[in-house]
């Protein structure tokens, strides 16, 4: 008995000319978004065949999801990770192909440390790619079977969870042609799109940071070079020479930031 053909996965779609066109741009954006995020643990949820963390320098990097090849096999809606244990979360096209994107974002907020960051990639509904999806052409195939999420909508979701967008970009303005030669002929639209219609890129990559209420960085207000010495607690010394040397060292001390955590409530705000 013949088996019905299986639907192409998103990972397989990225191997097509159209998918490779998108992936080339997204790889550069992921590299730029994660290379300056520091910490100890970073996790990519979904699409293990695409290493979105390759430019990140954290010592512990792993993938999580239901697909073969993930470091941690788990439902993307329920992560077997401790709360406040991760410094960076990357979601490559996970939200638009899941029935409960809100739950995924809640899990991201839960596992992220305060000031941890989240990077999200998605298809833009306000683009030629979004137009093709609305026309219903090949709606059952990737990526058209997904629920494209607009940037304003995503921003509101993140804001409700306490995340704060801090970076992002849209790209890939050419029509979603299936053949590479046509995508190359419309390559001129990349520079034109960045300049004239930047909100109409076919895909986006954004970064947000998790903020926590009651937490703020406080730096002393130094008015002059002697303020550092005055800020240090006085210590009784019998030897005046030692005391003078200590004061001189205090004037050369660098300003230190103090982290003040107030309140017992749990909150969050992410940066992107």
Residues covered by each model-derived region:
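Conserved catalytic loop of SAM-dependent methyltransferase domains
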Residues: 165-190, 199-200
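Short alpha-helix
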Residues: 135, 145-168
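A short SAM/SAH-binding and catalytic strip from SAM-dependent methyltransferases
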Residues: 87-102
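A short acidic, Gly/Pro-enriched loop at the edge of an enzyme's catalytic core
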Residues: 77-89
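Class I SAM-dependent methyltransferase SAM/SAH-binding core
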Residues: 28, 32-79
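C-terminal lobe and adjacent flexible extensions of AdoMet/dcAdoMet transferase-like proteins
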Residues: 188-272
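Conserved class I S-adenosyl-L-methionine
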Residues: 117-145
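A short glycine-rich, Lys/Arg-flanked "PGG" loop and its adjoining helix->strand segment in the class I
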Residues: 102-117
């Amino acid at each position: 008995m013949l088996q019905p053909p299986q639907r192409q996965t998103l990972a397989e779609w990225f191997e097509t000319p159209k998918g490779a066109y998108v992936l080339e741009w997204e790889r550069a954006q992921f590299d730029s978004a994660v290379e300056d995020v520091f910490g100890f643990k970073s996790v990519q949820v979904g699409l293990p065949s695409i290493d979105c963390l390759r430019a990140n320098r954290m010592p512990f990097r792993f993938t999580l999801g239901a697909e073969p090849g993930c470091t941690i096999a788990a439902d993307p809606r329920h992560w077997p990770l401790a709360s406040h244990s991760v410094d960076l979360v990357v979601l490559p096209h996970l939200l638009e192909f899941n029935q409960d994107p809100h739950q995924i974002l809640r899990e991201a907020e839960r596992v992220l440390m305060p000031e941890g960051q989240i990077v999200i990639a998605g298809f833009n509904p306000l683009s030629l790619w979004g137009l093709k999806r609305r026309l219903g052409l090949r709606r059952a195939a990737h990526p058209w079977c997904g629920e494209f999420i607009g940037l304003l909508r995503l921003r509101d979701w993140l804001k409700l969870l306490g995340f704060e967008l801090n970076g992002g970009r849209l790209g890939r303005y050419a029509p979603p042609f299936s053949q590479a030669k046509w995508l190359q002929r419309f390559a001129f639209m990349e520079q034109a799109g960045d300049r004239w219609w930047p909100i109409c890129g076919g895909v986006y990559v954004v970064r947000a940071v998790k903020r926590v209420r009651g937490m703020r960085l406080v730096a002393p207000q130094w008015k002059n070079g002697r303020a550092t010495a005055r800020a240090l607690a006085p210590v009784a010394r019998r030897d005046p020479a030692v005391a003078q040397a200590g004061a001189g060292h205090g004037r050369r001390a660098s300003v230190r930031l103090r982290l003040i955590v107030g309140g017992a409530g749990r909150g969050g705000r992410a940066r992107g």
